[in-house]
Structure formats: structure tokens, C-alpha cells
């Protein structure tokens, strides 16, 4: 039994490795992780959003860029990656640890990291030499500005409970948009090495 389990694990690792045949396909696992992260964010709710209405802010989520036809396939992958990386960075901070139930926060950060790890399998193959120029690509810059606005807001509000609640709701929107982008990539073929 242990041998069969070891063999199955080895097959999975080979299949998802850099040279593996499944390496650059968006998997169901990525979508399941995305859904689980949304559920965790929902469970992290500590305050009624209605009690924080005075702290609401429009962060300018670039939703139309992601959900519309503005992104080409070669832009969609780096935008998805950047959204997940910035989400992870937002929640993997000392300020965030003080604001949330640490068990749920750890689970969320782990889930975001799993999504990033899955995408890392493809990142070098998809982006390769283009990586430095993609960092300056308009959609990436837009995503970075969006998250910088969130960081600035939290700092301006002194990382208050209401500020974090507003950001939690906003991040649910952002991760929903990133899930939509994952679905679009899958419809584009899912094979991130194809043109």
C-alpha cells in the first residue's frame, strides 16, 4: 500500500514538474483553491459591513480590464499572477495578523500560496525572457496601482477594524475577478504555452 501511494505521489510530481505534460495547464485544483480562498475570506468577517459604511472607498478595481476583452492571452497570465501575488502580500503582513483570526488568515495565505505555486509551474515557461518587460505592461501597472491604493487606505485609516473589513469585502471582489480571469484562461485553451 505504501509503495502504491509513493508511486502515485511520484507520478503527480513528475506530471506537474517543469517538464511534465500537465505542468502548464490550468487545473481544476487552481479553481478549487480559488473558491476555497473566497470561502475563507467570507468566514473572516468580524464586523457587519453596514457598521463600516462611513469608511467605504472605491479602490478602482480594474474589473472591466479583466472581464472584458481588453486582455490578450499573453497578458492574462501575468495579470492573474500579479493579482494573486499582491493579494498574498496584503494578507501576509504583521498588520493583517493583528486584525484577523490567525487560523483563518494562515489558511487563506496558504491557499493563495498554493495558487501561486501552481502558476509558478508555468511562469518561466510562459513568460521567460518577457518577464522584465511584462512588469512594465499597462495591465500589470494598473493592478499594482490598485493594490497600492488599498495599502495606502489601510495606512491612512490606521489599520482599523473597519478599514480591514472594507478591504476584506474589496478582496472578495478582487479574488472573484481573478477567478473570472482563471476561467477565461481555461476557455482560451488552458495550455499557457500555446500562442
Curated annotation (Swiss-Prot):
Reported tissue expression: Constitutively and exclusively expressed in the mononuclear cells of the extraembryonic trophectoderm.
Subcellular location: Secreted
GO biological process: defense response to virus; female pregnancy
Disulfide-bonded cysteines: 24-122, 52-162
Pfam families: Interferon
GO MF assignments: cytokine activity; cytokine receptor binding; hormone activity
Signal peptide (residue range): 1-23
Keyword terms: Antiviral defense, Cytokine, Disulfide bond, Hormone, Pregnancy, Secreted, Signal
Main localization (coarse): secreted
InterPro entries named among the record's database cross-references: 4_helix_cytokine-like_core (IPR009079), Interferon_alpha/beta/delta (IPR000471)
SMART domains: IFabd
Stretches that traverse the bilayer: none
Source species, domain of life: Eukaryota
Primary role: Paracrine hormone primarily responsible for maternal recognition of pregnancy. Interacts with endometrial receptors, probably type I interferon receptors, and blocks estrogen receptor expression, preventing the estrogen-induced increase in oxytocin receptor expression in the endometrium. This results in the suppression of the pulsatile endometrial release of the luteolytic hormone prostaglandin F2-alpha, hindering the regression of the corpus luteum (luteolysis) and therefore a return to ovarian cyclicity.
Note, other: IFN-tau genes are intronless. They evolved from IFN-omega genes in the ruminantia suborder and have continued to duplicate independently in different lineages of the ruminantia. They code for proteins very similar in sequence but with different biological potency and pattern of expression.
Family that this chain belongs to: Belongs to the alpha/beta interferon family. IFN-alphaII subfamily.
Protein name: Interferon tau-4
Species of the source: Ovis aries
Taxon lineage: Eukaryota, Metazoa, Chordata, Craniata, Vertebrata
Gene encoding the protein: IFNT4
